[in-house]
Regions:
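Flexible "arm" and connector segments at domain edges
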Residues: 1-99
Length: 99
């Protein structure tokens, strides 16, 4: 199974709490916009620029989620526990075979 290992440094300055919580939603909408603009749904071929835009917006979403986690004081242990739970749920849903 392919696994992405990323280094994401959380911000040290945060927006007010509601704005911080809304940021991942805003960034996720930008991912959808980039995907929509790419025509990747089968209507056409994706250009390298469009692919780069999708990847950029996905990472921007990851960054905003990491910032939110940092702003509420999330620990590594909490992240590992949540990762295990999400993995188990996805196996249960048949999204991939367990390793």
């Amino acid at each position: 199974m392919k696994t992405y290992v990323l280094k994401v440094e959380p911000f040290t300055k945060f927006d007010e709490p509601k704005a911080q919580a809304l940021k991942p939603l805003e960034e996720a909408a930008e991912v959808f916009g980039a995907w929509q603009a790419s025509g990747i749904d089968g209507a056409g071929s994706i250009t390298p620029e469009m692919r780069e835009d999708i990847v950029y917006e996905c990472f921007d979403t990851i960054q905003s989620c990491v910032n939110l986690l940092e702003s509420i004081g999330t620990t590594d242990a909490e992240l590992r526990d949540s990762a295990r739970k999400v993995y188990a749920n996805n196996v249960e849903r048949g999204r991939y075979d367990p390793y």
